[in-house]
């Protein structure tokens, strides 16, 4: 009887980690591992919010600080373009982990260029160097994981 591989083994098998000095490598590996664990239990096809709640649980179990739906202010020449608008109109990060890595969650048929641009824009606006785009609507989650570094 073969043992079930842990999420750490799955990461090593399914995700090619670039050798060398990766920014927040250990943290992003933990986040990806948590996403794989969530996907194993929930599978594809649910609403994004379901995955967000499960991810918060998994990341907190790992001792990580997780903030969700973090408002992002859009500044233009010193003016806050979001100032005076209702809170629901704010740009929001799906997740910010350890105040270092932005995690944008999706549950879409196909990740499009606009999803990558959204993450890169959030990284620029918040001055965060690393972001993960994770699409849970994949049979193999690793096919829906994208790591961005600025």
Language model feature labels by segment:
Residues 47-48, 52-100, 108-109, 139-150:
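Active-site metal-binding core of divalent-cation-utilizing nuclease and nuclease-like domains
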Residues 27, 97-98, 127:
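Residue-level preference for short coil/turn positions at secondary-structure junctions
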Residues 42-44, 77, 130:
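Short glycine-rich loop/turn motifs that provide flexible caps or phosphate-binding loops at active sites
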Residues 1-23, 77-87, 93:
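Intrinsic disorder/low-complexity segments
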Residues 106-150:
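Nucleic-acid nuclease catalytic cores
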Residues 103:
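Conserved beta3 VAIK motif of the Hanks protein kinase fold
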């Amino acid at each position: 009887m073969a043992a079930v591989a842990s999420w750490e083994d799955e990461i090593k098998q399914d995700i090619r980690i670039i050798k060398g000095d990766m920014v927040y490598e250990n943290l992003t590996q933990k986040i990806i591992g948590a996403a794989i664990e969530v996907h194993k239990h929930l599978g594809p096809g649910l609403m994004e919010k379901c995955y967000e709640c499960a991810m918060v649980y998994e990341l907190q179990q790992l001792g990580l600080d997780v903030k969700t739906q973090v408002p992002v202010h859009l500044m233009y020449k010193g003016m806050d373009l979001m100032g005076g608008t209702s809170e629901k109109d704010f740009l929001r990060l799906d997740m910010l982990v350890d105040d270092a890595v932005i995690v944008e969650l999706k549950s879409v048929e196909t990740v499009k260029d606009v999803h990558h641009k959204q993450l890169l824009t959030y990284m620029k606006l918040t001055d965060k160097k690393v972001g993960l785009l994770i699409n849970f609507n994949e049979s193999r989650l690793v096919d829906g994981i994208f790591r961005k570094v600025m």
